[in-house]
């Protein structure tokens, strides 16, 4: 009787009150902007946030490179946070304007009206207990204050979208955005060409062939060699971190988020012929047959319009499956990941600081420009020592994360847990698509021997002792 009432409701009142097109429209906005389906939005938001922090540093003349908590001394206000998102929309609009023959971007315009970036208190954002998202504070990384992306839910979409759902989206967004931000900040280090390669050329004749000219070239090249050796550990660690974050991001976005969304959208529209797979999986003839079996779509019958309660229940299952596959329910993974992202921020700040110090030392040695209020030689020594320490912490954090991934893979949790009862439920009920097996990520990371974690019985050197600490 209840099923008949819901079917009758979905075929009459719901057709006018909550059409499927509006449901898919709002869910697409959440997919593109909260789940970072649009990479350009994430890049623009990260860039604008970093520019805001840099401008506040310049205003306060406070580059507390030796104090990680120094960032907290720069307090960003609510209006400035809103301005960051406004400039992000402007950057998105400018990017769209460069494509003359492109039609109006309706999802972007809808997101402009509904999406907000707000400051939140630590206790005000508590993800839904029903999906058990961990409380790791990824929202603290974008700016100097905890901020989250949220959205106004217009009526009648609030019939199936609840504030708890939006809190879950905000937590997932902060998680994905923080990983993307760390990866972007590390790759930007390679744009500092003088740090990567600096081989001074001899001056032109006749000075270049003189004894003084040759001595100057020797001095410059010796200085460049010393700096290159000082940066060698930093570049090796940064390269490994870029590889780890890049593969993790590709796994989370390309397999988990994309695959889960396609499965949910197919259920909404009633499509049964398509199977959600990543682009890499489509080109791989030897894809895991068990993974393919888990992705076999369920047959749907009858109408493909759903009543609000069915939509709400299915959407909560979708979010729960997404959070579990993203490992957001595993504090054993999210806590060391947050620590890694903090150390990467510290390492990037140190690299920029040492670059600034070396520029000042070059001016002092080559042009005679002396800053009487600064001791750059002492600062250089301090920063170089800290870079070695932080690089070791980054390496240790990555090794701990890989170990955590191996432990999660051994547990085999989340593959069927929590969704087995749905298979035996009503016909046509949404069953989350099985995506995101951790062993697929581990296979990619295994190509980097740098990530191998030694077992205790294998012995080890000083690095293993650091890990135990």
Regions found by a protein language model. Name each.
Residues 1-469:
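Long alpha-helical rod scaffolds of large eukaryotic non-enzymatic complex subunits
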């Amino acid at each position: 009787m209840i099923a008949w009432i819901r079917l009758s409701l979905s075929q009459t009142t719901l057709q006018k009150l909550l059409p499927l097109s509006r449901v898919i429209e709002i869910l697409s906005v959440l997919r593109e902007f909260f789940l970072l389906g649009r990479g350009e939005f994430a890049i623009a938001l990260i860039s604008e946030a970093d520019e805001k922090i840099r401008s506040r540093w310049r205003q306060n003349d406070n580059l507390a490179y030796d104090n990680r908590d120094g960032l907290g001394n720069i307090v960003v206000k609510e209006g400035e946070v809103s301005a960051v998102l406004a400039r992000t929309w402007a950057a998105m609009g400018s990017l769209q304007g460069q494509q003359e023959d492109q039609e109006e971007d309706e999802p972007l315009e809808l997101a402009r009206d509904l999406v907000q970036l707000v400051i939140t208190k630590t206790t005000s954002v508590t993800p839904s207990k029903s999906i058990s998202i961990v409380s790791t504070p990824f929202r603290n990384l974008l700016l100097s204050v905890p901020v989250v992306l949220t959205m106004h839910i217009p009526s009648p979409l609030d019939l199936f979208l609840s504030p708890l759902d939006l809190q879950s989206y905000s937590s997932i967004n902060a998680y994905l955005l923080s990983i993307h931000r760390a990866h972007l900040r590390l790759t930007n280090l390679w744009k500092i060409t003088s740090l990567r390669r600096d081989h001074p050329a001899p001056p032109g004749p006749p000075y270049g062939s003189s004894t003084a000219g040759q001595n100057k070239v020797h001095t410059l090249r010796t200085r460049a060699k010393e700096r290159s050796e000082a940066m060698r550990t930093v570049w090796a660690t940064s390269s490994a971190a870029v590889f780890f974050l890049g593969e993790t991001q590709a796994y989370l976005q390309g397999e988990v988020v994309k695959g889960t969304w396609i499965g949910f959208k197919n259920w909404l529209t009633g499509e049964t012929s398509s199977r959600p797979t990543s682009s890499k999986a489509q080109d791989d003839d030897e894809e895991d047959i068990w993974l393919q079996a888990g992705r076999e779509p369920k047959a749907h019958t009858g109408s493909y319009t759903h009543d609000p309660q069915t939509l709400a229940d299915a959407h909560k299952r979708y979010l729960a499956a997404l959070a579990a596959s993203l490992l957001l329910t595993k504090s054993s993974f999210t806590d060391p990941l947050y620590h890694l992202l903090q150390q990467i921020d510290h390492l990037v700040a140190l690299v920029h600081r040492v670059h600034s110090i070396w520029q000042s030392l070059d001016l002092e040695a080559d042009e005679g420009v002396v800053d009487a209020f600064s001791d750059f030689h002492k600062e250089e020594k301090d920063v170089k020592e800290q870079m070695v320490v932080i690089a070791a912490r980054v390496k240790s954090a990555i090794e701990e994360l890989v170990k955590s991934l191996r432990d999660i893979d051994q547990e085999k949790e989340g593959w069927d847990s929590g969704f087995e009862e749905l298979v035996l439920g009503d016909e046509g009920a949404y069953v989350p698509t099985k995506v995101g097996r951790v062993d697929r990520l581990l296979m990619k990371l295994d190509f980097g021997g740098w990530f191998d974690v030694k077992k205790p019985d294998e012995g080890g050197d000083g690095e293993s002792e650091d890990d135990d600490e």
